């Protein structure tokens, strides 16, 4: 039996209130659950102590038994400590592939880089060519002065 620690919605319309419950993963969101281990009231201020209440010992016990917390509950449990340790080590999602641009954008960026490289090479050649020609122009000027 796959267990989840998740939120079960309660409260009335436009006034949400959630219970943090341990339930079978196949059970409906607000359906049957095994045990209620806390509450979450999103209407309270984020710094309020009553916003999230969790029985940390029960949560740690269920995690040891194999219950998987959802992302939101894992965030809550990472702030709760048992014996000086967070119940869950939660880090903000890191998906580097999601941040990469799409194929077309990568192709356009490559084309821009190639054009910039070509332009820089042309500018370098143009800067080097007049420097070489300048002494050649100076030499005929000297010859004309001698003749």
Swiss-Prot record:
Gene name of this polypeptide: rpsP
Matches recorded under InterPro entries: Ribosomal_bS16, Ribosomal_bS16_dom_sf
GO cellular component, one term: small ribosomal subunit
Residue ranges with Low complexity bias: 119-147
Name this polypeptide is given: Small ribosomal subunit protein bS16
Cross-referenced HAMAP family: Ribosomal_bS16 (MF_00385)
Signal peptide: none
Bridged cysteine pairs (disulfide): none
Spans annotated as Disordered: 89-147
Organism: Hyphomonas neptunium (strain ATCC 15444)
Family designation: Belongs to the bacterial ribosomal protein bS16 family.
Gene Ontology process terms (BP): translation
SUPFAM superfamilies: Ribosomal protein S16
Composition-biased stretches (Basic and acidic residues): 97-118
Keywords for this protein: Ribonucleoprotein, Ribosomal protein
Gene Ontology molecular functions: structural constituent of ribosome
């Amino acid at each position: 039996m796959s267990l989840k620690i998740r939120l079960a919605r309660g409260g009335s319309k436009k006034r949400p209130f959630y219970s943090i419950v341990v339930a079978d993963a196949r059970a409906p969101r607000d359906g049957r659950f095994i045990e209620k281990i806390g509450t979450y009231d999103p209407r309270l201020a984020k710094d309020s102590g009553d916003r999230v209440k969790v029985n940390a010992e029960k949560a740690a016990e269920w995690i040891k038994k194999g219950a998987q917390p959802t992302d939101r509950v894992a965030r809550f449990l990472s702030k709760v400590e048992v014996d000086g340790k967070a119940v869950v080590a939660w880090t903000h999602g890191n998906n580097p592939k999601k941040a990469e641009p799409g194929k077309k954008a990568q192709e356009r960026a490559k084309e821009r880089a190639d054009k910039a490289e070509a332009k820089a090479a042309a500018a370098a050649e143009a800067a080097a060519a007049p420097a070489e020609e300048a002494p050649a122009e100076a030499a005929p000027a000297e010859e004309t002065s001698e003749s």
